[in-house]
């Protein structure tokens, strides 16, 4: 029992836990989902897990033991020898690499063995932020729980490195002798593996259960040496559960497909022959000093009303991203999700890439091409919740409500209509940690944007809560310590095993310690998404220009903790969804339909919209954080909104959400608009490209030098220094200022390096971009020097010393 602020707190974490089930039946016909050759990467190797039947066991033991086959030649399905996982001499008999073989591979590749460093004392957070000392009871308890977790993992699993390789033991694993399939389903009373390979006969391949609730079966090769389950064929696990007989997609399935005419997805046994495996050709880029992220959704990345493919995205969109000047691409909706309109956030199969866009090999090819272009690839990973589907997801997987998720109301997110993980479960930790590692290891993603972190960290999930920044909001009984511990574990695992990997957390609450290393007592993220900025811009755009407050803009953009790196954005995919508007649409509305052609007279609404669109994005990048994000298409002011194809939805309360007749018209990206030199979208795209290249050349987002010298509410002018640059924004709707004096820190000759009024960017060409600006000595706006400029209305101009390299 621990006391925090006078309230007793019983630790919620328990080592054992249980999963959940999904169910559906399949036909008896055999079917392969692969009709052509596909390139690929590497095999998945697995060690043996226990497999004795014990109907009384519902929990995972803290001292896990593993059963391995006695003699595969004599009795491939017999198990008799028991080895403790702590044993250093345990052998895997399924042609798994031995320790010597592994070390040989490590030596051949010149790779050092990867080890997650042990926890520190977690006390440095109090030096970084002295305000945290008031809450040391909570924070010390949190870190104590984390250290205990690490100790238990070291003791019973051989460390975090081994624990995060659950995909080598659970799910399907292939050896020279055959295929082993294991599934953790303690609620099931009986289980069998079914599929095309055995004509869906539930009596053909009955599984056995061990004392920890893990079901297992070994299928020896056919007499001709071929695997018992053909690559590309359908598979499921049939279980007798407390909820009845259920046919479920294996929880660790690596690929799943929805066949034409079928509603639920089918699990696919995915093990292509060597010649079809994609082999990565290009090294992963080093972590960029400043992140400029292009947020993208592969399915909706086509100009045509269709679901786009990994191959098309690789060939058509990646070069565009590179040309625009971004150095990272963040890909949404990678994990398989049966409901396309969920934008990828209702995940059903966590280890499977979305089959709508192609095969796993084609996704690997996409990532490899991005690396060739020097782009870092981040995955939008969803560990905050899961689809509540029982037919093709994790929900009710073994017939129980509390398998992978919390039982009862705590296990449901009423707003998202989804299930919530129990982060205090040992096997849930194994599942999610292994999932993160799988994407890094198998697909070579360079990091993650973790979705919905606020929902994870609080039992109220951030719903109907207005965070004010008061520290009592973060460190009390409404904080889910188990979830925070999981986030610490996954960040420690990622950064320990993949030092160049990047983690970004979507947190709207402003949780202190969020971006402090785990060793120092923090949660361990590299960046926090600065979500308040986008909300502020929408709030501003609903007001008249006369009501915009310069101080309000500056406060929102700079409201972040010292030493906490943030990703700023003016708008992301959230603002583009149906029911909302993009910034461009807020600004220009219906005029976008008729007045974006350069050969047609403009309107005041279009002129205002084009000017403010550029200014909003530049000041967001200039002041908002150490990284920047843009959702695809918004760089050129993509019109309208995103609306995924969907039918009418009837909710449980009887209400109806109208559909759009399954139209793809607003579920695509009209890149042709930004490329057309006869449309005004082109100028917005050119400006965004110039903005990215300016940051690349000057690196201002990661400079420690930032000074706001002018915040003039009467003139509507903001002047600030970031790095070696001086930014001047005139938000006034009519007033332009001649001989306007601005302060600067360094003397010398200045030049214009970016001008939003450039006609190339759809501006009015009111500035001489070849002019030189010489400084005067003497204090002005608290700066040692100053120079005189012309500041046209609704214009942003960036100045740099003329002798900058």
UniProtKB/Swiss-Prot annotation:
Induction and repression of expression: Induced by light when associated with glucose, fructose or sucrose treatment. Induction by glucose is mediated by the transcription factor ABI4.
InterPro entries reported for this sequence: A-amylase/branching_C (IPR006048), Branching_enzy (IPR037439), Glyco_hydro_13_cat_dom (IPR006047), Glyco_hydro_13_N (IPR004193), Glyco_hydro_b (IPR013780), Glycoside_hydrolase_SF (IPR017853), Ig-like_fold (IPR013783), Ig_E-set (IPR014756)
Disrupted gene: phenotype observed: Modified starch composition. This phenotype is enhanced when associated with SBE2.1 and SBE3 disruptions.
Pfam family, one: Alpha-amylase_C
Enzyme Commission numbers on file: 2.4.1.18
SUPFAM superfamilies: (Trans)glycosidases, E set domains, Glycosyl hydrolase domain
Transit peptide: 1-32
Protein's recorded name: 1,4-alpha-glucan-branching enzyme 2-2, chloroplastic/amyloplastic
Classification lineage: Eukaryota, Viridiplantae, Streptophyta, Embryophyta, Tracheophyta
